[in-house]
Amino acid sequence: MKALILVGGFGTRLRPLTLTLPKPLVEFGNKPMILHQVEALAAAGVTDIVLAVNYRPEIMVEALKKYEKEYNVNITFSVENEPLGTAGPLALARDILAKDHSPFFVLNSDVICEYPFADLAAFHKAHGAEGTIVVTKVEEPSKYGVVVHYPNSESLIERFVEKPVEFVSNRINGGIYILNPSVLDRIEPRPTSIEKEVFPAMVNDKQLHSFDLEGYWMDVGQPKDYLTGTCLYLSSLRKHKPEILAPASSNIIGNVLIDPSATIGKNCKIGPNVVIGPNVTIGDGVRLQRCAILKSSRVRDHAWVKSSIVGWNSTLGSWSRLENVSVLGDDVVVNDEIYVNGGSILPHKSISANIEVPGTIVM
């Protein structure tokens, strides 16, 4: 089987982290975001993966080629000279996607979930139409475009309704699809939206079904959703791979993922919902909650971090405090006793004064 991952462009929503690495290479749960998808695709029997990229492709190539042998997959890079939207990349990769006339998966690189690829493929084969999209249920459908089915069908899509004022459905597009190669005949190699142009045409022809996703789902393309997604991911690990999580103790509260190479000081309180990356050093008396500490960072004694992301190689000084979706880029230093409230700090900066106004960007 084959798959195309829509990697996309600049990752501006996840800055300042994406000023250092393309978004798919930013770690989520201590592995690059895109590796979660590659692993799941390989486990479902996918052997050919196309990455549609238009930003820093050389870094993507270097980083991901090493996974080909590990997961026994062929990874091909389809490089866009201009952004082609969510449908144009399919036309650009037509030779690969259509080569054996079998269906192929398409997915957005920002989506983290319990990927249902094997069940999705079986469901798609059973109904026989051109396409199937994964849908997930949400509590506030008025914020999204929703999927509406025909009254006599649980899966055949009748229409899409953008941000409905009155309730018509609570299912939204989950950013994961399986399509027959015939769908490629509907797409031209130009900037095109699969959601706004291709799918409505398929709906008109009664060729698009939906598949309900079980379990969690999150688009982790911006910091607050990255943190929420981390909570959901750790809960999923607790159900399916509890041995990966740190064992509960007087210092560990709830779901916590710690790389074996990290060093943890005395009298810390860590958790719930914390990820600590490789070669991280945590000092004595540190409090961490609902946060991610990325590779090779240092959190000095008695620092306090909540609902924040600490980028690679950064240092939090003693008695410093970071909260309210603060994000540190690569190699940031927050000096001792400094308070950062919802700040976004670009790489290689040193912070010596409090940041008290949420949304402040330090350039």
Swiss-Prot record:
PROSITE patterns, alphabetized: HEXAPEP_TRANSFERASES
Signal sequence interval, chain numbering: none
Disulfide bonds: none
E.C. number(s) listed in UniProt: 2.7.7.13
Reactions accelerated catalytically: alpha-D-mannose 1-phosphate + GTP + H(+) = GDP-alpha-D-mannose + diphosphate
Pathway: Nucleotide-sugar biosynthesis; GDP-alpha-D-mannose biosynthesis; GDP-alpha-D-mannose from alpha-D-mannose 1-phosphate (GTP route): step 1/1
GO cellular component: cytoplasm; cytosol
Pfam families associated with the record: GMPPB_C, NTP_transferase
SUPFAM superfamilies from the UniProt entry: Nucleotide-diphospho-sugar transferases
GO terms for biological process, alphabetical: division septum assembly; GDP-mannose biosynthetic process; protein glycosylation
Keyword Nucleotide-binding: yes
GO MF terms held by the record: GTP binding; mannose-1-phosphate guanylyltransferase (GTP) activity
Keyword entries, A-Z: Cell cycle, Cell division, Cytoplasm, GTP-binding, Nucleotide-binding, Nucleotidyltransferase, Septation, Transferase
Cell compartment(s), UniProt: Cytoplasm
Function field: Involved in cell wall synthesis where it is required for glycosylation. Involved in cell cycle progression through cell-size checkpoint. Required for the correct assembly of the septum.
The family this protein is said to belong to: Belongs to the transferase hexapeptide repeat family.
Name of the featured protein: Mannose-1-phosphate guanyltransferase
Gene from which the chain derives: mpg1
